[in-house]
Swiss-Prot record:
Post-translational modification: Methylated by PrmB.
Gene Ontology cellular-component annotations: cytosolic large ribosomal subunit
Protein task: One of the primary rRNA binding proteins, it binds directly near the 3'-end of the 23S rRNA, where it nucleates assembly of the 50S subunit.
Residues bearing the modification N5-methylglutamine: 150
GO biological process: translation
Gene: rplC
Database matches in InterPro entries: Ribosomal_uL3, Ribosomal_uL3_bac/org-type, Ribosomal_uL3_CS, Transl_B-barrel_sf
Keywords for this protein: Methylation, Ribonucleoprotein, Ribosomal protein, RNA-binding, rRNA-binding
Subunit structure, interactors included: Part of the 50S ribosomal subunit. Forms a cluster with proteins L14 and L19.
Species of origin: Salmonella arizonae (strain ATCC BAA-731 / CDC346-86 / RSK2980)
Protein's recorded name: Large ribosomal subunit protein uL3
Domain of life from the UniProt record: Bacteria
Length: 209
């Protein structure tokens, strides 16, 4: 089953009949329009390409305009692709709504996390700080040793150090689907999802469900 592209609206909470409060993220999933269908013969794999939302005409490049015109759909704010499983069929120009998730219990949500800028090891990797006193005057928040000796004589790849924090692709898995509101194109999932309000999100049925 393919996924859909939506927009993060924000967080709120809803109450069950028992009065239990459930924190939910509201995702607006406008109709996803099929712009291209890829097949084994021409592309070597089966996939469907979709767009959603709208883009100002003066922001659409000529190649994009041609691509959307060929598909017969309105220019959207981006292009996304989902692999097709055996038996799944879609046609160019088809519109896919949030009702796709009507019978789905759990989803995986992918987005771009909020950027935090250049961060030290304490903030970025939750390192412990060093002594506040007892002879320590300048090294309270430094990481300490980052390697060994002449052997191996290098810093290993992946070593946790200071650097850019956030603003990276993140996937949160197995979030419960609380409600599917097809009338208002809304999907409510339990808990938080990556990214700032208004960012694009890719919602797929959970792989571990």
């Amino acid at each position: 089953m393919i996924g859909l592209v939506g927009k993060k609206v924000g967080m709120t909470r809803i109450f069950t009949e028992d009065g239990v409060s459930i924190p939910v993220t509201v995702i607006e999933v406008e109709a996803n329009r099929v712009t291209q269908v890829k097949d084994l013969a021409n592309d070597g794999y089966r996939a469907v390409q979709v767009t959603t939302g709208v883009k100002k005409a003066n922001r659409v490049t000529k190649p994009e305009a041609g691509h959307f015109a060929k598909a017969g759909v309105e220019a959207g704010r981006g292009l996304w692709e989902f692999r097709l499983a055996e038996g799944e069929e879609y046609t160019v120009g088809q519109s896919i709504s949030v009702e796709l998730f009507a019978d789905v219990k759990k989803v995986d949500v992918t987005g771009t996390s909020k950027g935090k800028g250049f961060a030290g090891t304490v903030k970025r990797w939750n390192f412990r700080t060093q002594d506040a006193t007892h002879g320590n005057s300048l090294s309270h928040r430094v990481p300490g040793s980052i390697g060994q000796n002449q052997t191996p004589g290098k810093v290993f790849k992946g070593k946790k150090m200071a650097g850019q924090m956030g603003n990276e692709r993140v996937t949160v898995q197995s979030l419960d689907v609380v409600r599917v509101d097809a009338e208002r194109n809304l999907l409510l999932v339990k808990g938080g999802v990556p990214g700032a309000t208004g960012c694009d999100l890719i919602v797929k049925p959970a792989v571990k469900a």
